[in-house]
């Protein structure tokens, strides 16, 4: 099976569009506070930031964003991380 990333994921004759985003949640209530689409960041760049296991090469699983990841994401996104108030993660959804 051949995997490719273009505007979607091509699997055989089927194309599944996916969207990656940074989501953040209030620490006090765990309520979703915001989302930012990050589809402009190359998949290889995201892999180097989050180092997924071999079973998740396409970053389908959510990944926590801590200080280290925030610093590496900073050149790519316009978001001020406030770790005292929010938790952050990279998410992937079918679009």
Spans of features found by a protein language model:
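A short beta-strand micro-motif
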Residues: 20-25
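Short intrinsically disordered, low-complexity coil segments enriched in acidic
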Residues: 1-2, 58
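Short, flexible N-terminal segments of the mature chain
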Residues: 31-56
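Acidic, low-complexity intrinsically disordered segments
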Residues: 49-95
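Intrinsic disorder/low-complexity signal
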Residues: 7-9, 34, 38, 68, ...
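Short, basic and Ser/Thr-rich N-terminal targeting/leader segments
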Residues: 16-18, 86
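Short, Lys/Arg-enriched N-terminal segments with co-localized hydrophobic residues
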Residues: 2-15
